[in-house]
UniProtKB/Swiss-Prot annotation:
Residues 38-101 form the S5 DRBM domain. One of its GO terms (molecular function) is structural constituent of ribosome. Keywords: Ribonucleoprotein, Ribosomal protein, RNA-binding, rRNA-binding. One of its GO terms (biological process) is translation. The N-terminal domain interacts with the head of the 30S subunit; the C-terminal domain interacts with the body and contacts protein S4. The interaction surface between S4 and S5 is involved in control of translational fidelity. This is Small ribosomal subunit protein uS5. The keyword Cell membrane does not apply. Belongs to the universal ribosomal protein uS5 family. The lineage of its organism: Bacteria, Bacillati, Actinomycetota, Actinomycetes, Mycobacteriales.
Amino acid sequence: MAAQSAGLLGDSREGRSRREGGSRGGRDRDRDGEKGNYLERVVAINRVSKVVKGGRRFSFTALVIVGDGHGMVGVGYGKAKEVPAAIAKGVEEARKSFFRVPLIDGTITHPVQGEAAAGVVLLRPASPGTGVIAGGAVRAVLECAGVHDILAKSLGSDNAINVVHATVAALKLLQRPDEVAARRGLRSGMLPRSWDPAGVAGERSVDRPVGRVREQA
């Protein structure tokens, strides 16, 4: 009788653990699927300390880049007592700071330079097949944004935080050729070479008069 009771108890525990494991696995799969929609890059993790009356209190900070690989990217900075919690906070902040990067055929629309504190980053468009020619922190931002061909160079501080924010500042300065042409009352292919030295606008944008319908020959 006791053996039967023990067997029933074991079966019930096994069934309960199987059900709980299945539910946890389902939740984990849901989280992985949601995470799979975005590219996440942890650029830097630092340990910081705070001196209090009882001694020192240690915590961790994480600089995280999140993007969809198709022109949306954001930067987040998280702080917590544990590394995973700091990364999670950084990811949440990065998703709240998403912005759109104008891209044409996998590269940026024109050369641009961004600055943040002592960080200075220069970005130039590149022809297809060039790849992402950039350093670690700059590369993380560009890859998450979905840039496939670009030339980048850091001209200022090597601090990862400054470099990342300088890269973001540069990307936020980008403009689409058709928008600039519309403001100037020009065709998209008539922009000066000084603004578009790589010829991206004239070759890959819609070439038509602004505000008028092209007369048929």
